[in-house]
């Protein structure tokens, strides 16, 4: 099992909205990647939001980060303090 992890810092008070939009927008994009196994979104009191995707191979995890970061940059930038980061 392989994990793709993306993290972003929401603007003050926007973490719940950011998490909601991630669940609604990213899951359809990520779940379409072959090898997808699961998806989780968590947020911390400091407005950090972390999305974790699980895959059955490393290439799928990397592909999901590529797709997710493109979507985040296009659709979530107004809610973020700086760019999101990703690792697989």
Question: What is the predicted function of each stretch?
Answer:
Residues 1-50, 54-70, 77-88:
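Short S/T/G/P-rich N-terminal loop/turn motif that feeds into the first structured element of a domain
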């Amino acid at each position: 099992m392989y994990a793709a992890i993306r993290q972003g810092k929401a603007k003050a008070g926007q973490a719940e909205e950011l998490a909601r939009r991630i669940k609604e927008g990213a899951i359809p994009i990520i779940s379409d990647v072959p090898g997808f196994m699961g998806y989780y979104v968590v947020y911390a009191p400091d407005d950090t939001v972390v999305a974790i995707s699980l895959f059955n191979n490393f290439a799928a995890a990397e592909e999901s980060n590529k797709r997710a970061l493109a979507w985040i940059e296009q659709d979530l930038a107004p809610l973020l303090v700086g760019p999101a980061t990703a690792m697989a």
